[in-house]
Swiss-Prot record:
The keyword Signal applies. The keyword Cell membrane does not apply. The chain crosses the membrane at residues 770-790. One of its GO terms (cellular component) is host cell endosome membrane. This is Envelope glycoprotein H. Residues 1-18 form the signal peptide. Glycans are attached at residues 62, 116, 247, 279, 410, 434, 469, 576, 727, 750. It comes from Gallid herpesvirus 2 (strain RB-1b) (GaHV-2). It comes from the Viruses.
Length: 813
């Protein structure tokens, strides 16, 4: 399957079947497979019960598996075909059908013998040298106590839920029977790697995701589960969990039992690992052991999902290399797999599952798999795909979606009534169930709720009143994600997304970048020193969404280092690290890596939402030197770069270091290049309800060519603060605040740029009384010291002169 050899084999079979080849030509085909004993080719289509003792035949889901048990090069080969075709079949007359040859057959024919086969399923015995920890059932991602069902709030059916439960899902519990219905579906596990005899199991869900760099298949049941990880840059590997009562056998050598990794584990299931061990690298063996340890550590959902986020964070903080990517990708996907296994297992043991866990599970699957595709294995994020079958019956999944739709429609009419936490619940539900992508006005409603939250948090951000806590960070992530999840060709979708990008850039100030880097450093320490439970969104920042690319410039690192004294966790960590400044540099590098890796690649975001920038730019210059992109209107964008090369109205920024030059280009089709002139002016006060500055951006830069912030003026309230000057309550707009430095430009949506003189003149004239008093006292002291010094020198000169005169007189005598 997917190999050239299989194509050749299928063509030969198809030609043979199409001609309805007579009996006497059959041996020529069988001789190709090395089959001399014709009866050994068994086409038994009995039911499962009727052939339970015969592992040479299976019928599952309208498919018959045909096993070749002859002593031949094809020994142990498994074929499978539609049962309807098999039922019409006689041994000597086969109808035209799609007969699929297993990878085993093709590999076997290509390699010639089992001994030289490059993909052996055996692995050196694994034995733990440490004691297996017990389940850490008390571990949670937050400080809240887990809610439990009570007599007045028992587990219920999904049909009894109400829209209010979407904004308060933690206290609603669903019966486990709602996951599967009255009867659990039994299916046949056909090993994607074609190594194992098919296994019958109670199936709950299948998840397939990947990109052009990798593909992962997860199959999860009640007593059986498997994950197959395939990559372009590494051999595939498969992890299987099976109840102890079930034996796992290899297809070849014929029906040979496949030994579990460790028979003596205390877990209720056995662990099987399939992967190459001949010439396996240390990284391969290390990843195998880590995968096994992730199974043995705990069967608690909270622990496993916390470890998934921790490993994803470590992956993001790890320097890019093929070896690191392969290892980390396997570790993260295995942890995600184990969290799903734990969720299903716990639900069937307890008889219920919380409504919140159902929604969080779907959101985690999407967020984690999509994040992996953003930076792992040199993948193109545009090739990411996710095929996730829910662990709910279709009609029950529709009930949940209907609840979410009603909640969104109601919330869009009055977003002010929702708290940050309720925004989080609603937007996470919409994201998890792809509500933004549904037809009708639902996408517009979700975008409306998301944008209102972004506007509210932006207002708090510029006023320095925002609490960057867990709820705010998570809610903001899902708000942006829900907007970008909406198809861009829908009415108003692209305009909303461009506005969201402006808000993200406005919140990504110089101070916020520094604060976020320090928060990331603290999380890294928590994971590595304390092994505390974390969530990757605990360090989410608008800078991840913003089209600001100067995050890793050196001045941010210097500011972060100077603020370390305000973070005791980091300070203590560095004090205990003998590497000194190298340890601090390492933490800074990891923080920058996390932000950079979590960002959607610039060209992908621009291609979708700011195509005029891509059209009017040299791609190499854009990716190499762009510092900031502001899609300021529906048709045009500002691009700030270090080099010329963007076609549009080009402004050469004066007053900056010649070695760190800034160019601002207003880009709009048809990409006509002209020279712009930045005009200095005093902003006139608008009359009445006019809002001439609404939609503008206040950009501030320093004389060394560094961008400080880009504040989006989105409302009349912010316009009033802008023109209030020294009376403004927003420090970004108040020239009298001492720490404000640099030049301020106002960028208009039509491509006009002006330099605001108020900031420059105020910076010269506004001097604090404390500064004047200190300077005067210092000058007085300096003058006094100078006078005393001069007097001492004069006295010393006089004294020496008199001594000289006395000596002269003595010589004369």
């Amino acid at each position: 399957m997917g190999l050239p050899g299989s194509i050749v084999f299928l063509i030969m079979i198809h030609a043979f079947c199409a001609k309805k080849t007579p009996t006497n030509t059959l041996p020529s085909l069988l001789s190709l497979l090395g089959i001399t004993d014709l009866p050994s080719l068994r086409l038994n289509i009995l039911s499962l019960d009727g052939s339970a003792n015969n592992q040479g035949s299976w019928v599952r889901d309208n498919t018959t598996f045909v096993y070749i048990g002859a002593s031949s090069p094809a020994n142990g080969v498994l074929f499978y075909m539609p049962t309807s075709h098999v039922q019409q079949m006689t041994f000597y007359k086969r109808p035209v059908s799609k007969l699929l040859a297993s990878n085993n057959l093709i590999k076997f024919l290509n390699t010639g013998s089992y001994i030289n086969h490059s993909f052996m399923t055996a692995m050196p015995p694994y034995r733990r040298n440490v004691q297996i920890p017990s389940d850490r059932s008390g571990l949670k991602l937050d400080d809240k106590d887990d809610a439990q069902p009570t007599g007045t709030n028992p587990p219920t059916e999904l049909k009894n839920l109400k829209p209010i439960d979407v904004v308060n899902p933690e206290h609603r519990f669903i019966l486990t029977s709602e996951l599967t219905g009255t009867y659990v579906k039994h299916v046949c596990f056909v090993d994607p790697m074609d190594m194992l005899i098919p296994v019958d199991y109670a199936h709950i869900r299948t998840i397939i995701f990947g990109s052009d760099g990798a593909e992962v298949i997860m199959k999860i049941g009640i007593t059986f589960a498997s994950i197959t990880i395939s990559m372009k840059s590494a051999p595939p590997v498969e992890l299987i969990l099976s109840e102890r009562a079930r034996n796992i056998s290899l297809i070849w050598p014929a029906l040979k039992p496949y030994e579990p990794v460790d028979k003596f584990t205390r877990r209720p299931y056995l662990i099987y690992l399939l992967g190459p061990h001949m010439n396996a690298s240390d990284m391969e063996i290390k990843s195998y052991i880590n995968m096994i340890e992730s199974v043995e550590e705990s069967s608690n959902y909270d622990f496993q999902i916390a470890q998934t986020h921790a490993q994803l964070f470590i992956f993001a903080a790890t320097p890019i290399s093929d070896i690191n990517d392969i290892y980390c990708f396997r570790v993260v996907t295995t942890r995600l797999f184990m969290s799903l296994v734990a969720s299903v297992r716990n639900a069937f043991q307890s008889g219920y599952i919380s409504f919140d866990e159902i929604i969080k599970t779907e959101a985690n699957i999407k967020m984690i798999t999509e994040t992996l595709s953003t930076f792992a294995l040199h993948s193109n994020p545009g090739t990411y795909f996710l095929l996730s079958g829910m662990h709910l019956r279709n009609e029950n999944a529709d009930i949940i979606k209907s609840l979410i739709r009603k909640t969104i429609i109601n919330a869009s009419k009055n977003t002010a009534s929702l708290s940050i936490l309720q925004h989080l619940y609603v937007l996470r539900s919409a994201y998890a169930f792809n509500i933004s992508q549904e037809s009708g006005n639902l996408g517009e409603h979700v975008s409306s709720i998301s944008l209102e939250l972004i506007i509210a948090l932006h207002e708090e951000s510029v006023r320095d009143t925002i609490a960057w806590n867990t709820s705010a960070r998570h809610a903001l992530y899902y708000a942006f994600a829900s907007i970008f999840q909406r198809p861009p060709n829908e009415w108003d979708a692209s305009r909303t997304a461009r506005k969201a990008l402006l808000f993200a850039s406005s919140m990504c100030t110089e101070e916020h970048i520094v604060a976020t880097e320090l928060v990331i450093q603290e999380m890294y320490i928590k994971i590595n020193v304390k092994n505390s439970p974390v969530h990757i969104l605990d360090v989410y920042t608008p800078c991840v969404t913003a089209l600001r690319m100067d995050i890793s410039e050196h001045h941010h690192r210097l500011y972060a280092m100077s603020d370390v004294i305000l973070h005791p966790v980091i300070e203590k960590y560095l004090e205990n690290d003998s590497r000194g400044i190298d340890a601090e540099e390492e933490l800074e590098t990891k923080a920058e890596l996390v932000i950079t890796k979590l960002k959607t690649p610039l060209m992908r975001r621009l291609t979708i939402y700011a195509s005029e920038v891509v059209t009017c730019s040299d791609a190499d210059i854009l990716e190499a030197t762009a510092l900031l992109v502001l899609p300021i209107s529906g048709l045009g964008s500002y691009v700030v770069t270090r080099q010329l090369g963007i076609r549009g109205i080009v402004y050469n920024v004066d007053g900056v270091d010649v070695n760190n030059q800034l160019y601002i280009t207003y880009v709009r089709l048809p990409c006509t290049t002209t020279a712009g002139n930045i005009v200095p002016m005093v902003l006139p006060r608008p009359l009445g309800s006019d809002c001439p500055y609404c939609g503008c951006v206040l950009l501030r830069y320093s004389t060394n060519g560094n961008l400080r912030h880009t504040i989006y003026i989105s409302s009349q309230d912010l316009q009033r603060e802008l023109i209030a000057g020294g009376n403004s309550s927003i420090r970004y707009f108040n020239p009298t605040i001492a720490q404000i430095y640099g030049t301020s430009l106002l960028l208009y949506p039509n491509g006009t740029i002006v330099r605001i003189l108020a900031f420059e003149s105020e910076r010269v004239t506004i001097i604090s009384a404390t500064y004047v008093a200190t300077a005067t006292a210092g000058a007085s002291i300096a003058i006094s010291i100078a006078i005393i010094t001069v007097r001492m020198r004069i006295n010393n000169f006089r004294y020496n002169y008199h001594r000289y005169k006395k000596l002269s007189l003595y010589d004369d005598l």
